[in-house]
Every structure is written in structure tokens, then in C-alpha cells.
């Protein structure tokens, strides 16, 4: 069984989530929310890859893979006249606290297991302005 994908932290949700050529086909590419965040941090903010990875709470390698996939999708849309729809992915907006369903421990790191009892039953804790992990979420 493959490892579950951890939620990537994003700090920005765009005002508009659909962009299309003035004239064009009905084809579109789906840009995940975390892919847009990678482009924003690296290309717009001009941060170093290490800083981007830290902000998104992923490894440098994972950040690089997210960024490459995002750039491919944007290039495909621009070169081939496709629309871009921004939605979905595995992300948490802002900071999130996690709760172990086994022992009740609350912690801030996005981990596959509880640091206290090592249970894999860990969920994003909703409460007081904390984020919620969106997994393959349509729209926002």
C-alpha cells in the first residue's frame, strides 16, 4: 500500500480559479492548489527552493516535483491554447493542528503517525482558525 500523501501548506488562494484563451478549444488542464502555490513562491516571490519547501512543509525533492508538474501544465495550456482550472489537490490553508484519534495528542507537524503513541490514526484538527486538509477537493 503506498504512503498517504501529506497535505501541503498553502498561504494563498486565488481570487479567480479559471483562465481561458479568448478563442480556443474546450480543452483544459487542472492545476492543483499546491501547484499554484509552488509557482507563486518560486517564480513570483523569487524564494530559494529550500525556503519554498519549508513554507509548504514538504521536502525539497517533493517541492521540485510539484513545481515541475505545475510548470508543465501551465506550458501545455499556453502553448496549446487550453484553459487552466485551479482546483483540487492535497493541501491545508494556513496552519493546521493534528489530533491523534488513538491517544488524543495534539501536535502541529504533518506526520503519518502520532509522535506520542505512534498510531497512524491522525487527522487535521479543526478549530479556532486552524486549517483543514483538503484531499482531492473540488473547488476550494
Swiss-Prot record:
InterPro entries: RNA_pol_sigma_r3/r4-like, UPF0251, WH-like_DNA-bd_sf. Signal peptide: none annotated. Pfam families: DUF134. Belongs to the UPF0251 family. PANTHER family: PTHR37478, UPF0251 PROTEIN TK0562. This is UPF0251 protein Athe_2281.
